[in-house]
């Protein structure tokens, strides 16, 4: 049974070896002459504005965490939608409870003002 996964394992091993080999090979034969231009932060070909070590507002992290939360919701809803007929009423109730819990969390975040950008 595990033999069916052997080609995937071989592909993963080859991909990891190729990635590591590329990094090691380039570090061995590449030039190692740092300069101020090479050490400067890169901003899409434009001149850097301000410091690259500037601190981000906590709001960015909050939005990222909320995105991950609702992205996980989509990950759980997709298989449920595919297997809807096979799961029957149990699956419908189970997903209903899941969506209600997420909706309560969304309302909580909304009431706390986490979605307001000021």
From Swiss-Prot:
Reactions it catalyzes: a quinone + NADH + 5 H(+)(in) = a quinol + NAD(+) + 4 H(+)(out)
Keyword match Cytoplasm: no
GO-annotated cellular components: NADH dehydrogenase complex; plasma membrane
Superkingdom classification of source: Bacteria
EC number: 7.1.1.-
InterPro entries documented for this protein: NAD(P)H_OxRDtase_bac/plastid, NADH_UbQ/plastoQ_OxRdtase_su3, NDAH_ubi_oxred_su3_sf
Subcellular location: Cell inner membrane
Membrane topology: Multi-pass membrane protein
Transmembrane segments: 5-25, 62-82, 87-107
Keyword vocabulary terms for this entry: Cell inner membrane, Cell membrane, Membrane, NAD, Quinone, Translocase, Transmembrane, Transmembrane helix, Transport, Ubiquinone
Major site of localization recorded for this protein: membrane
Pfam families found in the cross-reference section: Oxidored_q4
Keyword Translocase among UniProt keywords: yes
UniProt cross-references to Gene3D superfamilies, sorted A to Z: NADH:ubiquinone/plastoquinone oxidoreductase, chain 3
Molecular function terms from GO: NADH dehydrogenase (ubiquinone) activity; NADH:ubiquinone reductase (non-electrogenic) activity; quinone binding
HAMAP family on file: NDH1_NuoA
SUBUNIT field: NDH-1 is composed of 14 different subunits. Subunits NuoA, H, J, K, L, M, N constitute the membrane sector of the complex.
Annotated function: NDH-1 shuttles electrons from NADH, via FMN and iron-sulfur (Fe-S) centers, to quinones in the respiratory chain. The immediate electron acceptor for the enzyme in this species is believed to be ubiquinone. Couples the redox reaction to proton translocation (for every two electrons transferred, four hydrogen ions are translocated across the cytoplasmic membrane), and thus conserves the redox energy in a proton gradient.
Similarity section: Belongs to the complex I subunit 3 family.
Protein name: NADH-quinone oxidoreductase subunit A 2
Organism listed in the record: Citrifermentans bemidjiense (strain ATCC BAA-1014 / DSM 16622 / JCM 12645 / Bem) (Geobacter bemidjiensis)
Gene encoding the protein: nuoA2
């Amino acid at each position: 049974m595990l033999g069916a996964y052997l080609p995937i394992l071989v592909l993963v091993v080859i991909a990891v070896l190729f990635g590591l080999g590329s990094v090691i090979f380039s570090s061995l034969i590449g030039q190692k002459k740092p300069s101020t231009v090479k050490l400067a932060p890169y901003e899409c070909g434009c001149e850097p504005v301000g410091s690259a070590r500037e601190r981000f507002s906590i709001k960015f992290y909050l939005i990222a965490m909320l995105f991950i939360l609702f992205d996980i919701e989509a990950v759980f809803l997709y298989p449920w939608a595919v297997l809807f007929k096979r799961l029957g009423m149990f699956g419908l109730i189970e997903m209903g409870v899941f969506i209600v819990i997420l909706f309560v969390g969304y309302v909580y975040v909304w009431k706390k003002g986490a979605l307001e950008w000021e």
